[in-house]
Amino acid sequence: MSSISDTQVYIALVVALIPGLLAWRLATELYK
């Protein structure tokens, strides 16, 4: 196995961003 590839880095970023985006959308809906 080689070191972390660019694809794995992008996948990790997407996985980390999805919950943040969902939380942001929920917050904007609550504040309306």
Curated annotation (Swiss-Prot):
GO cellular component labels: photosystem I; plasma membrane-derived thylakoid membrane
Membrane topology category: Single-pass membrane protein
Keywords of the record: Membrane, Photosynthesis, Photosystem I, Thylakoid, Transmembrane, Transmembrane helix
Disulfide-bond pairs as recorded: none
InterPro entries: PSI_PsaM, PSI_PsaM_sf
GO aspect biological process, one term: photosynthesis
Predominant cellular place of this UniProt entry's protein: membrane
Places the protein is found: Cellular thylakoid membrane
HAMAP family per UniProt: PSI_PsaM
Family indicated by similarity: Belongs to the PsaM family.
Protein name, entry field: Photosystem I reaction center subunit XII
Native organism: Nostoc sp. (strain PCC 7120 / SAG 25.82 / UTEX 2576)
Gene (UniProt): psaM
